[in-house]
Design a protein with these regions (language model features):
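Alpha-helix C-terminal capping segments
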Residues: 12-23, 45
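Gly/Ser/Thr-rich beta-alpha loop segments that engage phosphate groups in nucleotides
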Residues: 9-10, 117
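Short secondary-structure boundary/capping segments within folded domains
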Residues: 4, 16-19, 73
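Short pre-catalytic strand/loop immediately N-terminal to key active-site residues, enriched for Gly-Thr
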Residues: 1-7
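Conserved N-terminal subdomain of the carbohydrate kinase-like
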Residues: 23-115
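Conserved beta-alpha-beta core of the PfkB/ribokinase-like small-molecule kinase fold
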Residues: 110-127
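Residue-level marker of alpha-helix boundaries and capping positions
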Residues: 4, 29-30, 121, 125
Length: 127
C-alpha cells in the first residue's frame, strides 16, 4: 500500500503556524513539474504563502527533482523506517546566489531554518 503526502521539517512548521492563525510563508526551490507544482498547491491549500517559491527549470537544476523521503510504517516490535532521497534535488542544485536574500527576508520578523537541508545546497555558504 503506497500513500503519497507532502511534508518535511520546515514545511511542517509553516503548516502548524498557519493552523494556529500565524501568517506563514514558505520558501524553497522545487522543480517546475507536476510534483513541484502539486507541493506548492498543497501548501497554499493549507494557508501557507508560497509567493517567493522558485519553480526551477531543467536548465537551472539539471536533475530537476523534488527531494523525497519514504516512510515504512513499523508494525509490532518492528520500528518505522525513513529513507531520505534529497541528493541532487532542485533545492540542492539551484544557484542560491541568484536569490536576493535581503529582499526575500524584508518584512519578516522570524526566519526558521532547521535540520541539515540548507547544508545540502551546493551554494550553502551564501546562507
Amino acid at each position: 500500500n503506497f500513500e503519497a503526502s507532502y511534508g518535511g521539517s520546515e514545511a511542517n512548521i509553516a503548516l502548524a503556524l498557519a493552523n494556529l492563525g500565524v501568517d506563514s510563508t514558505f520558501f524553497s526551490v522545487v522543480p517546475n513539474n507536476s510534483l513541484g507544482k502539486s507541493a506548492v498547491r498543497w501548501l497554499r491549500s493549507n494557508d501557507v504563502h508560497c509567493t517567493p517559491m522558485i519553480l526551477s527549470t531543467p536548465e537551472e537544476t539539471p536533475t530537476h527533482r523534488l527531494g523525497t523521503y519514504y516512510l515504512e510504517t513499523g508494525y509490532g516490535i518492528r520500528p518505522s523506517k525513513v529513507t531520505y532521497d534529497r541528493k541532487h534535488s532542485a533545492f540542492t542544485e539551484y544557484d542560491l546566489s541568484k536569490v536576493d536574500l535581503d529582499a526575500l527576508l524584508d518584512g519578516f520578523d522570524w526566519l526558521h531554518l532547521s535540520g541539515i537541508t540548507p547544508l545540502w545546497a551546493r551554494t550553502a555558504p551564501i546562507l
